Amino acid sequence: MSVTRDDVRKVARLSRIAVPEERLDELAGELNGILGWIDQLNEVDVEGVEPMTSVVETKLPMRDDVVTDGNIQDQVLANAPRSEHGFFVVPKAVE
């Protein structure tokens, strides 16, 4: 699969990113390079290799799984440009 100028233009439009026409070829090349690396990774034989999250084995401290709201709603909403009834108010994002 190869990424074309039209693919870059479409992704930019869907993600609402302004991409100048003169950069479309450059970005298509970069994305094709990334996809090439992914193809190389897919060729690696990982049969029998245990999944890991770190090269150093560590133990994370355990704590009780307790549901809490944090009791800091006012502090959190203080950072919001706008809130109503204890919730963030954001602009409509779906057309």
UniProtKB/Swiss-Prot annotation:
Domain of life where this protein originates: Bacteria
Catalytic activity: L-glutamyl-tRNA(Gln) + L-glutamine + ATP + H2O = L-glutaminyl-tRNA(Gln) + L-glutamate + ADP + phosphate + H(+); L-aspartyl-tRNA(Asn) + L-glutamine + ATP + H2O = L-asparaginyl-tRNA(Asn) + L-glutamate + ADP + phosphate + 2 H(+)
Enzyme Commission code(s) on record: 6.3.5.-
Species: Hyphomonas neptunium (strain ATCC 15444)
Record Pfam families: GatC (PF02686)
NCBIfam families named in the record: gatC (TIGR00135)
Protein name per Swiss-Prot or TrEMBL: Aspartyl/glutamyl-tRNA(Asn/Gln) amidotransferase subunit C
Subunit structure: Heterotrimer of A, B and C subunits.
Record GO biological process: glutaminyl-tRNAGln biosynthesis via transamidation; regulation of translational fidelity; translation
Molecular function GO terms recorded: asparaginyl-tRNA synthase (glutamine-hydrolyzing) activity; ATP binding; glutaminyl-tRNA synthase (glutamine-hydrolyzing) activity
EC top class named in words: ligase
Keyword Ligase: yes
UniProt xrefs under Gene3D superfamilies: Glu-tRNAGln amidotransferase C subunit, N-terminal domain (1.10.20.60)
Protein family according to the UniProt entry: Belongs to the GatC family.
Keywords of this entry: ATP-binding, Ligase, Nucleotide-binding, Protein biosynthesis
Purpose: Allows the formation of correctly charged Asn-tRNA(Asn) or Gln-tRNA(Gln) through the transamidation of misacylated Asp-tRNA(Asn) or Glu-tRNA(Gln) in organisms which lack either or both of asparaginyl-tRNA or glutaminyl-tRNA synthetases. The reaction takes place in the presence of glutamine and ATP through an activated phospho-Asp-tRNA(Asn) or phospho-Glu-tRNA(Gln).
